A protein has these predicted regions:
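Residue-level signal for inorganic ion chemistry
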Residues: 15, 61, 110, 140, ...
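Active-site metal-binding loops of divalent metal-dependent hydrolases
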Residues: 38-40, 111, 141
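Long, positively charged amphipathic alpha-helical accessory segments at protein N-termini or as interdomain linkers
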Residues: 6, 68-102, 113-180
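N-terminal lobe of the biotin/lipoate ligase/transferase fold
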Residues: 1-98, 165
């Protein structure tokens, strides 16, 4: 695996925006960089949607990688890899709690348990010639939040499913290990 750098922020507008600003200022670290946050004030989703996350309750991270071996028409593979990693981790935690809820992927970027959304991913890639120079993969997973106040139609958290708190830091490591 490539060098893995981690930046933990107590509060940020958006982890994807933070990584984008880091790229724009030339502050890129070698290898893979993961930016996590306890609180995100302007989390973004697809088509301008926002992502709600109660402070310290959920997984919020952006992973920056440099997949220059992937040609732009094949960039969907990055979304597939992240979705499969999240699906596998959530399925394991649900099964370990003795529950039988099915975790499914709604392509290209959402993870559902039953008919409720537990995770969303926003991917932003930079192209250079015929390859992808940078890819920011922002992921939000509802882990320990119990009340959702936004107008999102169907959110759910892992805690609502398994009736127990989960360790967000450990889950991030599980997802990243599977993705990388």
């Amino acid at each position: 695996m490539e060098q893995l750098n981690q930046i933990n922020l107590p509060k940020v507008d958006s982890t994807n925006t933070f990584v984008r600003d880091m790229l724009d200022s030339g502050g890129v670290l070698p290898g893979i960089t993961i930016v996590t946050a306890d609180e995100q004030t302007a989390g973004r989703g697809q088509t301008g949607n926002s992502w709600e996350s109660e402070k310290g309750k959920n997984i919020i991270f952006s992973l920056l990688c440099h997949p220059d071996f992937i040609v732009p028409p094949k960039q969907f593979i990055l979304s597939q890899c992240m979705a499969l990693a999240v699906q596998q981790v959530l399925s394991k935690h649900i099964a370990d709690a003795g529950k039988e809820d099915v975790v499914s992927i709604k392509w290209p970027n959402d993870i559902y348990v039953g008919d409720k959304k537990i995770c969303g991913t926003l991917i932003e890639c930079d192209l250079m010639g015929k390859s992808i120079s940078n890819c920011i993969i922002g992921t939000g997973i509802n882990v320990n939040q119990m009340v959702f106040t936004s107008d999102a139609p169907n959110p759910v958290s892992l805690k609502q499913i398994i009736d127990a708190d989960s360790d967000c830091d450990a889950m991030i490591r599980e997802v990243v290990d599977l993705f990388c």
